């Protein structure tokens, strides 16, 4: 990312403004006035930094298919009797490496929609593409997701029951460096057979990572945008999943904003490379495993569409290579 001409204009004028202000008032003037000048410079600098956001028309897109996974937690994934691909995973193969083919997924969607793997009711739209774009600079990672949100959730699917009834939610999970098989399975290490909305599970038990350790890197960092209702009340979440899902505490997500018109949604995340507890520290040259989840038609819990596991590279070769 580079500064635009408008950014240079703002920064240069901010500099001359502060110089003039301090010279005019002299060293004998009050500290209060000096601080006012510095604050004004800070405002202009912040404005200039915002103007340096990516020109998305110049950032490459990559379609990632998200799908309704039904009742297929990590325990199912690693059960050879249920999932023949367990052997490949055990050998180091990724789910995407096996199931992504010519831009789509070769999954058995008839089985995924059956009572065996979706005992409640499957949505009519079992999969759809999400166009992902990514860019970064010295301070931030920028991600944009574009997709057409379906409105045909299965009858009986868990839905929002408290205002605002979020029509759409879009989330990205980043796997910590010590998550087992993180680069292979995406966010599946947070999905277990005993979490809420799974058959017979505790309705209060949230997503978790087995043997989680935030300091040790065995956890997921995640960011989410929630649409609110009728274009109002949108919110954002900066949390993580360790011993349980925590929807607060993150300090890296600067802004999540989105818009849905006639079902066409565009969601943009601005995330600092550094952050607080639960925020993965990112740097140029790094490759981060991730997964995408979209809740459409006011659904909650496991009634979402999710991606397989992919990798994001900050200037490094990966499934998605973020532009600098």
Ranges and model annotations:
Residues 1, 8-30:
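Short, Lys/Arg-enriched N-terminal segments with co-localized hydrophobic residues
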Residues 30-38:
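Bacterial N-terminal signal peptides that target proteins for export
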Residues 39-46:
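Bacterial N-terminal signal peptides
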Residues 52-82, 162-165, 169-228, 276-324:
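Acidic/polar low-complexity flexible segments
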Residues 52-92, 106-131:
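Sequence context of c-type cytochrome heme-c attachment sites
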Residues 92-102, 191:
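The canonical Cys-X-X-Cys-His
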């Amino acid at each position: 990312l580079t500064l635009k001409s408008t950014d240079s204009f703002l920064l240069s004028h901010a500099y001359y403004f502060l110089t003039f202000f301090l010279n005019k008032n002299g060293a004998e003037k009050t500290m209060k006035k000096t601080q006012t000048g510095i604050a004004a410079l800070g405002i202009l600098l912040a404005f200039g930094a915002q103007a340096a956001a990516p020109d998305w028309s110049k950032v490459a897109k990559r379609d990632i298919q998200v799908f309704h996974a039904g009742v297929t937690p990590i325990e199912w994934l690693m059960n050879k009797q249920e999932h023949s691909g367990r052997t490949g995973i055990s050998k180091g193969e990724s789910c995407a490496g096996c199931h992504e083919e010519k831009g789509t997924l070769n999954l058995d969607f008839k089985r995924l929609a059956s009572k065996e793997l979706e005992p409640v009711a499957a949505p009519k739209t079992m999969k759809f593409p999400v166009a992902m774009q990514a860019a970064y600079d010295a301070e931030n990672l920028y991600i944009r997701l574009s997709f057409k949100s379906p409105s045909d959730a299965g009858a009986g699917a868990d839905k929002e029951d408290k205002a605002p009834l979020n029509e759409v939610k879009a989330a990205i999970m980043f796997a910590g460096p010590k998550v087992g098989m993180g680069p292979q399975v995406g966010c599946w290490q947070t999905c277990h057979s005993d979490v809420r909305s799974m058959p017979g599970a505790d309705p209060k038990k949230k997503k978790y990572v087995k043997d989680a350790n935030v300091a040790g890197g065995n956890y997921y960092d995640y960011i989410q945008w929630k649409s609110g209702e009728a274009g109002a009340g949108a919110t954002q979440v900066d949390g993580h999943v360790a011993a349980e899902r925590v929807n607060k505490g993150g300090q890296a997500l600067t802004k999540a904003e989105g818009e849905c018109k006639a079902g066409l949604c565009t969601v943009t995340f601005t995330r600092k490379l550094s952050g607080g507890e639960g925020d993965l520290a990112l740097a140029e040259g790094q490759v981060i495993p991730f997964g995408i989840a979209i809740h459409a038609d006011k659904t909650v819990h496991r009634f979402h569409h999710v991606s397989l596991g992919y990798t994001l590279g900050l200037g490094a070769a990966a499934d998605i290579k973020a532009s600098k």
